[in-house]
Amino acid sequence: IGLFAFLREAGVWGPVLIVAPLSTLGNWVSEFQKWCPSIEVLKYHGTREQRKSLRAALEEETTMMRAKVVVTSYEMVRMDSHAFAAREWFYIVIDEGHRLKNNECQLMQCLFTFAHSPNTSRLILTGTPLQVCRAHLLSPRTT
């Protein structure tokens, strides 16, 4: 959160996607509200109908300008990857990054569909040693 506050203050800023376990989504939102209340955060999670309205909101120009951080779960990335692929991300953060087992895991396959832009930076957060070998993280599909 501090990184994004710094980047925003430095004028180096764009849409951020944070992919995290469902149980931590509320914590991400509340921590942004606590430490960087000027950064608007959108929690992307819910029923099919709720997600449909969230997707419509993301497509609106005004929402895209305001909601600079979108917090979602691994499951939502897999289910609605097309919605995330429609937007160019400045940063993609993967919380609990040890979930990225290899290039063939479902989450990695979904991330490949919309994290391919050379302008997108990626950040993996984990407290557990990664199971992915360095070659997978640095492969042409992930850079």
Segments from the language model and where they lie:
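ASCE P-loop NTPase motor core, strongest for the SF2 helicase catalytic module
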Residues: 1-143
